[in-house]
Design a protein with these regions (language model features):
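Extracytosolic ligand-binding ectodomains
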Residues: 1-251
């Protein structure tokens, strides 16, 4: 192959979330935006959650542009799952949280993909963001080598904090540079062989691929909004705070 992945494949994206079973979760409602990303995660997560003994009581997709979630929130309340998880983006995750609050749905655990990793999530939701989980590929507090330094230098240069795409781009450059150094040449075949076989710790985390070029060396992190801050709660080696579970019901 000539394509090598540095980020977590969709099939493994939610691996860090499966600690939910250890926390006491028994039932899961899974909703997702009908994008390629959402549908890939839905298929993989359905299989893996069932392997871990978690019962899926609802799995439902919605158009990515949807913002009215009143009907979906009502169905989620009816199934009364311990965990509600959404494969979503910023605007739809915010809209879904608001709909759940309006409907009075209070799961023991609530999480999303992209939305909670962004500061705007809590800026818009205020206290309703408290306790919500997010799955992220990188956070500057993750203790990855160079994370704090990169975040500082990026903010100094561009005037805002780096997002995951900046980290991915920088990491891809690190990985390619390392492969060229190990190969001792820019010859295509020699560099490709290093990319295929090498182990390297980039800013985004460990790089190690299988025979198809699929990333298998790294796993995502799980954060939780606590006291208006994003705090890592899993995996254990990067956790800053213990998980709040179950969530405190709010009116």
């Amino acid at each position: 192959t000539n394509i090598f992945g540095a980020d977590t494949p969709a099939g493994d994206y939610l691996e860090g979330l499966y600690f939910a079973a250890d926390a006491g979760v028994k039932t899961v409602a899974f909703v997702y935006a009908k994008t390629d990303f959402g549908e890939d995660l839905a298929a993989a997560s359905k299989r893996k959650m069932e392997e871990r003994g978690l019962q899926l009581v609802l799995i439902e997709g919605y158009p990515p542009e949807q913002r009215d979630f009143a009907a979906l929130a009502k169905r989620l309340g009816e199934v009364n799952a311990d965990l509600i998880f959404g494969v979503s983006y910023l605007d739809d995750s915010i809209a879904l949280v608001r709909a759940l609050k309006k409907e009075g749905v209070n799961p023991k655990m609530l999480g999303f993909t992209v939305g909670p990793g962004l500061r705007e999530f809590a800026n818009q939701l205020g206290a309703d963001a408290e306790g919500v989980l997010g799955v992220v590929q990188w956070l500057r507090s993750s203790r990855e080598p160079g994370a704090q330094d990169f975040a500082y230098r990026f903010a100094q240069r561009y005037g805002y904090n780096p997002g995951v795409y900046a980290v991915m781009g920088y990491s891809a450059g690190q990985i390619l540079e390392s492969a060229i150094r190990l190969a001792g040449t820019t010859d295509h075949d020699a560099v490709r062989e290093q990319l295929r076989t090498m182990y390297f710790r980039a800013l985004i985390g460990p790089y190690n691929v299988n025979e198809t070029g699929r990333q298998q060396g790294r796993r995502n992190f799980v954060l939780q909004w606590q006291d208006n801050q994003r705090r890592l709660v899993a995996p254990e080696q990067v956790a800053e705070r213990p998980l709040i579970y179950p969530l405190r019901a709010t009116p």
